[in-house]
């Protein structure tokens, strides 16, 4: 799998993620004869080959630069072409933890979509695990099939993923009774697919499920379906992830604030005088008199400016954060552009048959 192997340098044929800005990452297929163009200029692929991943690469015009990063599921989530709404990394991390997806886990995913979750699961379960993912939309299925083959995720190219074009709500899941350890449903009506899972849950150990739904009404329907079919430990979680940045804020004293107000007032008065002078010049019909008046007024203006500039002007130069010549205090600021919550997460557990029978006999 492309996303599970790591190397130091860019090679011809690689899939890379180009970092153009904080919120702008795009996938690039490195081909020696191609050139990538953006607002900073041209970036020939031939000059990228041999560079280290993470190295700064300047445009031919030296007007800007990009970074080439080796793709990971986390970076791919930020760079992938959106075919549907996607699952972001904060939700993916919690789903992995609650479903206990680890190396060697067998997972069913219904609703491949843009395959953000598929890439993360495939990387986690490794070569000993299996991902059975289903997509009912024909066009999205074909796009995902090509993408998975290029990323070496499919079973027929040495990967661990089975991709199937199927409407699981109507036709169920696999034709064979494959047992899985975890189930992830990203469907408009997951409660219609839940009854079809009975042939695929383990009877000798627990099987865990997550339903990913944007509306609380969908969660209610899914919870009722799970409860009726004997699933337990049903809970809903909403991930409200925030990233806080530690910064320093300059302490401004009252004297400095007063000086700044005086400076603003002085500039406003000067601007008024200049506008007044231009109006008088426009009204003058005698050019010679106009010039004389202009000279005298400029002289008066200069004298007034020299008098008022006796006040210490407030500097407009940029002050570097943490400059030792100023006083600073530590503050924190939340990143408002962070992509996290998109839906509610409904979790449940299906107990092994023997343990479930014991629980029913003993009662609550």
Curated annotation (Swiss-Prot):
GO cellular component, one term: nucleus
Entry's localization field: Nucleus
EC number: 2.1.1.220
Binding site for S-adenosyl-L-methionine: 114-116, 135, 140, 167-168, 186
Pfam families in alphabetical order: GCD14
Keywords from the named record: Methyltransferase, Nucleus, S-adenosyl-L-methionine, Transferase, tRNA processing
Coiled-coil annotated residue ranges, if any: none
Enzyme class (EC, first level): transferase
SUPFAM superfamilies the UniProt entry points to: S-adenosyl-L-methionine-dependent methyltransferases
UniProt GO MF annotations: tRNA (adenine(58)-N1)-methyltransferase activity
Region Disordered, residue ranges: 280-309
InterPro entries listed in its UniProt record: SAM-dependent_MTases_sf, TRM61_C, tRNA_MeTrfase_Gcd14
A GO biological process held by the record: tRNA methylation
Function (record text): Catalytic subunit of tRNA (adenine-N(1)-)-methyltransferase, which catalyzes the formation of N(1)-methyladenine at position 58 (m1A58) in initiator methionyl-tRNA.
Family: Belongs to the class I-like SAM-binding methyltransferase superfamily. TRM61 family.
Assembly, per entry: Heterotetramer; composed of two copies of TRM6 and two copies of TRM61.
Protein name stated in the entry: tRNA (adenine(58)-N(1))-methyltransferase catalytic subunit trm61
Organism: Schizosaccharomyces pombe (strain 972 / ATCC 24843) (Fission yeast)
Gene that this sequence comes from: cpd1
């Amino acid at each position: 799998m492309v996303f599970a192997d790591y190397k130091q340098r860019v090679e011809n044929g690689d899939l890379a993620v180009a970092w153009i800005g904080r919120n702008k990452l795009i996938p690039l297929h490195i081909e020696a004869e191609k050139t990538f163009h953006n607002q900073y200029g041209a970036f020939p692929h031939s000059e990228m080959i041999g560079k280290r991943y993470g190295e700064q690469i300047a445009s031919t015009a030296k007007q800007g630069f990009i970074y080439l990063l080796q793709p990971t599921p986390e970076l791919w989530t930020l760079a992938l072409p959106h075919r549907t709404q996607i699952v972001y990394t904060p939700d993916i991390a919690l789903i992995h933890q609650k479903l206990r997806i680890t190396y060697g886990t067998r997972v069913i995913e219904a609703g491949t979509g843009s395959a953000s979750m598929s890439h993360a699961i495939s990387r986690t379960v490794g070569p000993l695990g299996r991902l059975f993912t289903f997509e009912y939309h024909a066009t999205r299925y074909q796009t995902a099939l090509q993408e998975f083959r290029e990323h070496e995720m499919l079973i027929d190219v040495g990967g661990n993923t089975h991709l199937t074009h199927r409407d699981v709500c109507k036709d169920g899941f696999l034709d064979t009774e494959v047992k899985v350890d975890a189930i992830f449903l990203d469907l408009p009506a997951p409660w219609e697919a839940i009854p079809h899972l009975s042939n695929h849950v383990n009877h000798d150990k627990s099987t865990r499920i997550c339903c990913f739904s944007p509306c609380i009404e969908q969660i209610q329907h899914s919870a009722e379906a799970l409860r009726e079919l004997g699933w337990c430990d049903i809970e809903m979680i909403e991930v409200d992830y925030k990233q806080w940045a530690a910064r320093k804020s300059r302490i401004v004293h009252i004297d400095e604030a007063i000086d700044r107000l005086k400076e603003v007032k002085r500039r406003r008065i000067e601007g008024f005088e200049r506008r007044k002078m231009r109006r008088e010049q426009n009204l003058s019909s005698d050019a010679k008199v106009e010039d004389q008046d202009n000279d005298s007024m400029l002289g008066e203006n200069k004298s007034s400016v020299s008098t008022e500039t006796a006040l210490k002007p407030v500097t407009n130069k940029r002050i570097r954060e943490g400059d030792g010549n100023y006083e600073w205090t530590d503050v924190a600021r939340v990143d408002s552009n962070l992509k996290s919550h998109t839906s509610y997460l409904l979790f449940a557990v299906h107990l092994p048959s023997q343990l479930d029978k014991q629980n029913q006999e003993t009662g609550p």
